[in-house]
């Protein structure tokens, strides 16, 4: 599909398909950061090519890290195979890259963060290890994304920072002393991950203590810790305290898992249509928060079967609403709200206040769009309640430049006629999403 501003999802077709999902954005950008502070070359296989990962790669290049694209080898191509469409198999070719880090980074540059939280919260810490000034800027909506956790922490670590939100400038001195640090920030787990990922290059390592309100999306911090240990970094965690010791890292060969969060709309779409979707290369063990789909979707009435490397989700014809604490999996909330909108009984999702600070205020956006279709949805500071009703109005589903809002509109569009504005915002994490969606759910 050529770039398009408007997209009308296929309506009312029972889905029966198999597909492979592109590599995980969250894993890709974590491995890229660590590869940039290692000694020696690293190769990353099945790297996701999307706006967020391209911004990370370009940011690393701008501070002096050499990154080369290699000829892709392997079988983790992305595509859909369904009874009516086999032409989309191998639609998206993943990438293999070689990262050649610099021993000492010296630079004076500008880095575009777009709307990528991993870029704006991971790279500034690495910039603090550089000798020179790095200015960070981004999309218009980036200014509303909280940055206090990262920038206040850098200041406490002795790094000069001008500004409190996008745009801001980090003035690195070539090293960070490290040591003990306390933080009370709780609007995003990425603040913790960003500090941990580069901490083995701090002169004295890092002992990071979080106090105050619970952190959201804790599985993403667990993912960070697992990635660090994969690289041989000594990191421990106990009672809200993470400790990282200094270490010189060697290069590695890394293979990126499929992005399980990007599988969510396709799995949910199968439930909505009463069909069946098989996701290939599903890991048997993973740190990705998308793994919780295995437990959550059956609560809505889905049937799930697994093999050694696949998962199949089938709709039963009935969708039951649920009450659930989704604080640990905020990225999945918009798609689950879309599913709940099409259920037969009410749903309540709580402890999700942090998703107000994602690419857009996702709680407000979901209330606005579902209400505009005639749905019944209410919200508070940190919860959403959906009372299923017949959607009575067609119209344009606004995405707010948010990829999860776009995929949520696509789910509802399987049952109710609508047009999605700016479907290409999905390229943030899932290039050519609309082509794959039409292939999976079209006639």
Swiss-Prot record:
Gene behind this protein: aroA
Protein name listed in UniProt: 3-phosphoshikimate 1-carboxyvinyltransferase
One Pfam family cited in the UniProt record for this chain: EPSP_synthase
NCBIfam families xref list: aroA
UniProt keywords, alphabetically: Amino-acid biosynthesis, Aromatic amino acid biosynthesis, Cytoplasm, Transferase
GO MF entry, a single one: 3-phosphoshikimate 1-carboxyvinyltransferase activity
Pathway linked to the protein: Metabolic intermediate biosynthesis; chorismate biosynthesis; chorismate from D-erythrose 4-phosphate and phosphoenolpyruvate: step 6/7
Gene Ontology biological-process annotations: amino acid biosynthetic process; aromatic amino acid family biosynthetic process; chorismate biosynthetic process
Protein family: Belongs to the EPSP synthase family.
Residues annotated as the enzyme's active site: 331
Chief location bin: cytoplasm
Assigned EC number: 2.5.1.19
Binding-site residues for 3-phosphoshikimate, renumbered to this chain: 25-26, 30, 188-190, 217, 331, 358
Catalytic reactions on record: 3-phosphoshikimate + phosphoenolpyruvate = 5-O-(1-carboxyvinyl)-3-phosphoshikimate + phosphate
Assembly and oligomerization: Monomer.
Binding site for phosphoenolpyruvate: 25, 117, 145, 190, 362, 404, 428
Cited InterPro entries: Enolpyruvate_Tfrase_dom, Enolpyruvate_Tfrase_sf, EPSP_synthase, EPSP_synthase_CS, RNA3'P_cycl/enolpyr_Trfase_a/b
Subcellular location: Cytoplasm
Function summary: Catalyzes the transfer of the enolpyruvyl moiety of phosphoenolpyruvate (PEP) to the 5-hydroxyl of shikimate-3-phosphate (S3P) to produce enolpyruvyl shikimate-3-phosphate and inorganic phosphate.
GO annotation, cellular component aspect: cytoplasm
TM spans (from-to): none
């Amino acid at each position: 599909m050529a770039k398009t501003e408007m997209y009308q999802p296929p309506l009312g077709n029972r889905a029966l398909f198999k597909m492979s999902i592109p590599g995980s954005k969250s894993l890709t950008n974590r491995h890229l950061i660590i590869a940039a502070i290692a000694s020696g070359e690293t190769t990353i296989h099945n790297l996701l090519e999307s706006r967020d990962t391209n911004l990370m790669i370009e940011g690393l290049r701008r501070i002096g890290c050499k990154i080369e694209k290699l000829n892709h080898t392997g079988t983790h191509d992305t595509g859909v195979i369904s009874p009516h469409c086999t032409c989309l198999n191998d639609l998206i070719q993943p990438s293999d890259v070689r990262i050649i880090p610099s021993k000492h980074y010296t630079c004076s540059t500008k880095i575009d963060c777009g709307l990528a939280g991993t870029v704006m919260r991971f790279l500034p810490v690495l910039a603090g290890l550089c000798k020179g000034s790095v200015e960070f800027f981004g999309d218009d909506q980036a200014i509303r994304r909280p940055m206090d956790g990262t920038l206040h922490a850098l200041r406490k670590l002795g790094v000069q920072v001008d500004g409190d939100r996008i745009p801001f400038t980090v003035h690195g001195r070539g090293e960070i002393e490290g040591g003990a640090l306390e933080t009370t920030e709780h609007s995003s787990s990425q603040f913790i991950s960003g500090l941990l990922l580069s901490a083995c290059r701090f002169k004295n390592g890092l002992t990071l203590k979080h106090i105050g309100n619970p952190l959201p999306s804790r599985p993403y911090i667990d993912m960070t810790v697992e990635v660090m240990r994969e690289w041989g970094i000594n990191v421990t965690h106990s009672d809200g305290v993470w400790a990282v010791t200094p270490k010189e890292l060697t290069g590695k060969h890394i293979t990126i898992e499929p992005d399980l969060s990007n599988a969510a709309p396709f799995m949910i779409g199968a439930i909505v249509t009463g069909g069946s979707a098989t996701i290939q290369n599903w890991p048997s063990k993973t740190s990705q928060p998308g793994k919780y789909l295995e437990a959550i979707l059956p609560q809505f009435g889905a049937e799930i079967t697994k093999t050694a490397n696949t998962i199949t989700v089938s709709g039963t014809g009935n969708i039951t609403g649920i009450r659930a604490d989704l604080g640990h999996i905020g990225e999945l909330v918009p798609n689950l709200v879309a599913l709940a909108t099409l259920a037969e009984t009410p749903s309540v999702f709580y402890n999700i206040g942090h998703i107000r600070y994602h690419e857009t205020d996702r709680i407000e956006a979901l209330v606005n769009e579902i209400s505009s279709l005639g749905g019944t949805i209410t919200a508070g500071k940190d919860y959403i309640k959906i009372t299923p009703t017949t959607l009575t109005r067609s119209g344009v589903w606004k995405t707010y430049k948010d990829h999860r809002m776009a995929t949520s509109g696509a789910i509802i569009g399987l049952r109710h006629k609508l047009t999605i504005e700016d479907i290409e915002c999905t390229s943030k994490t899932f290039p050519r999403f609309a082509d794959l969606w039409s292939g999976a759910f079209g006639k």
